[in-house]
């Protein structure tokens, strides 16, 4: 699994990286603009991400806006809905508007409120078919 972690908080970023490195390679972005650039570069190199874990509240471009831009790029690339990257949004806020925006505007696959348990994330990766069942 090839993942992109988009997180401005160092500790949160390191925790996600430690979890996801067990399952494959991870790239890091610290804001939404870097995420968009990393997403484009991965496609240019014919090595698209399988998963993006993206924080919502970040500097430069927030996670919601970055996700909408990534979804637009996927449309521009002519991707079908079954070819788009799986995105898990993460946030410290349990805000209903943010949840709705993540799912309906950004078509996120899942949404986690920090802090969350490692087992929860691994279970969700299996549900999303990014990891094999045991």
Predicted regions mapped to residue ranges:
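Receiver (REC) domain active-site loop signature in two-component systems and cognate sites
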Residues: 58
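A Lys-centered signature of the CheY-like receiver
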Residues: 113-114
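Conserved acidic carboxylate
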Residues: 7
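Helix N-cap/capping motif at the beta->alpha junctions
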Residues: 10, 21, 28-41, 63-66
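Alpha4 helix (beta4-alpha4-beta5 surface) of REC/receiver domains from two-component response regulators
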Residues: 65, 77, 82-83, 94-110, ...
């Amino acid at each position: 699994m090839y993942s992109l972690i988009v997180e401005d908080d160092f500790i949160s970023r390191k925790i996600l990286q430690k979890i996801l490195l067990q399952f494959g390679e991870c790239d890091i972005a610290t804001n939404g603009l870097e995420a968009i650039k990393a997403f484009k570069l991965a496609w240019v190199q014919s090595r698209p991400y399988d998963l993006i874990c993206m924080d919502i509240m970040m500097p430069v471009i927030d996670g919601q806006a970055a996700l909408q831009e990534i979804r637009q790029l996927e449309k521009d690339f002519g991707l079908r809905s079954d070819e788009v990257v799986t995105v898990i949004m993460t946030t410290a806020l349990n805000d209903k508007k943010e949840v709705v925006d993540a799912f309906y505007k950004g078509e996120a696959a899942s949404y986690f409120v920090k802090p969350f348990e490692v087992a929860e994330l691994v279970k969700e990766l299996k549900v999303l078919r990014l990891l094999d069942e045991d």
